[in-house]
């Protein structure tokens, strides 16, 4: 199913953006990269914070089944 995200209404676009933020937090947690989920949650709109928590739980559960690649931070 292909969908043009630019044609979504603003409320759906906000939900997509919040879901993307939750996926980013779960990704960083999976690779033991520094991230503070509460700080990212506070950056989300007030009415979508519960959606952020739901999506974060879903992404965390999905990442249990995924393999890990070694994370090597950039050396300066």
Curated annotation (Swiss-Prot):
SUPFAM superfamilies the UniProt entry points to: DNA polymerase III theta subunit-like
A molecular function GO annotation: DNA binding
Claim: 4Fe-4S is one of the keywords in the record: no
Swiss-Prot/TrEMBL GO biological process terms: DNA-templated DNA replication; lagging strand elongation; leading strand elongation
Xref: InterPro entries: DNA_pol_III_theta_bac, PolIII_theta_sf
EC number: 2.7.7.7
Highest taxon in the source lineage: Bacteria
GO CC field: cytosol; DNA polymerase III complex; DNA polymerase III, core complex; replisome
Keywords attached to this entry: DNA replication, DNA-directed DNA polymerase, Nucleotidyltransferase, Transferase
Keyword set includes Transferase: yes
Subunit structure: The DNA polymerase holoenzyme is a complex that contains 10 different types of subunits. These subunits are organized into 3 functionally essential subassemblies: the pol III core, the beta sliding clamp processivity factor and the clamp-loading complex. The pol III core (subunits alpha,epsilon and theta) contains the polymerase and the 3'-5' exonuclease proofreading activities. The polymerase is tethered to the template via the sliding clamp processivity factor.
Protein name (database record): DNA polymerase III subunit theta
Source organism of this protein record: Escherichia coli (strain K12)
Lineage of the species this protein comes from: Bacteria, Pseudomonadati, Pseudomonadota, Gammaproteobacteria, Enterobacterales
Gene name as annotated: holE
């Amino acid at each position: 199913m292909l969908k043009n995200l630019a044609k979504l209404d603003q409320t759906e676009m906000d939900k997509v953006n919040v879901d993307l933020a939750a996926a980013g937090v779960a990704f960083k947690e999976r690779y033991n990269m520094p991230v503070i989920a509460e700080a990212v949650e506070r950056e989300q709109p007030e009415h979508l914070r519960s959606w952020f928590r739901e999506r974060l739980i879903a992404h965390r559960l999905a990442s249990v089944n995924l393999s890990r690649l070694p994370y090597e931070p950039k050396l300066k």
